[in-house]
A protein has these predicted regions:
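Interfacial helix-loop-helix hairpins and adjacent transmembrane helices
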Residues: 1, 28-34, 40
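Transmembrane helices with small-residue packing motifs
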Residues: 1-28, 70-72, 94, 135
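Flexible hinge/switch segments at interdomain interfaces of large molecular machines
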Residues: 11-18, 76-83, 117-135, 139, ...
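Extended, hydrophobic alpha-helical segments in both membrane/secreted and soluble proteins
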Residues: 20-22, 39-42, 55, 155, ...
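Flexible glycine-/small-residue-rich
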Residues: 24-28, 57-59, 87-91, 123-125, ...
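A generic structural signal for alpha-helix starts
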Residues: 29-30, 93, 97, 143-147
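Solvent-exposed, membrane-proximal periplasmic/extracellular interface segments of envelope transport
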Residues: 34-131, 186-193
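Beta-strand-rich non-transmembrane domains
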Residues: 144, 149-193
């Protein structure tokens, strides 16, 4: 019945908390300045919402974490290409929309922000029940990296094909471009370096 969608399943209802966050993952090798620029752009977009009371941005350093962040290992998010935007909303009695409705609105609005290819922006809502690593998580195991990546790409494509699965991401990302310089000792001598 679940497979053919005759019976819809929702394990826990959406909660209506007074906080949300947006996690930012630029491609590995990106500078903290680039991460901060994206965080500031996200902050500019979300502060246009009347329900947002305050915003705090973090780039290249872990944001203060709550119980949800403890389980999601937020304290490890300290690389230059990682950022977070923490949002405090008006108390639920002072706003008409639920935090989930606000999160959906934010998700749509931040799609318009120009970001480098391979950047992931995820709107994170505190879960109504116990915290989890992700709402939906697939772990791929295999003999070698090439096989794992090929299978992961198929799983990711399957996730992306489902309309209600949002903020699809993977942990292998896009490899950072590398610059390799070969130094010629003859040239160094010639230019007196």
């Amino acid at each position: 019945l679940f497979y053919i969608k005759d019976v819809t399943v929702k394990l826990l209802p959406f909660d209506n908390k007074s906080e949300l966050s947006v996690t930012i993952d630029l491609p590995e090798g990106s500078s903290v300045e680039a991460t901060d620029a994206v965080a500031q752009a996200v902050a500019q977009v979300v502060t246009q919402l009347e329900e947002v009371r305050s915003v705090q941005t973090h780039a290249g350093t872990a944001a203060p974490f709550n119980f949800n962040g403890l389980v999601r290992h937020s304290y490890y998010r300290s690389d230059p290409y990682m950022g977070d935007v923490a949002l405090n909303l008006l108390p639920k009695g002072e706003r008409e929309r639920s935090s989930h409705e606000i999160a959906l609105d934010i998700r749509e609005r931040i799609k318009a922000i120009p970001v480098p290819e391979g950047t992931s922006l995820k709107v994170v809502e505190p879960p109504p029940g116990p915290p989890v690593m992700a709402t939906l998580l697939a772990e791929i195991y295999g003999e070698n990296a090439a096989t794992r990546r090929a299978v992961a790409e198929k799983v990711e494509a399957a996730f992306r094909s489902v309309p209600y699965i949002v903020d699809v991401d993977n942990s292998y990302g896009i490899a950072a471009r590398k610059l390799r310089a070969r130094i010629s000792s003859d040239d160094l001598d010639f230019f007196k370096v």
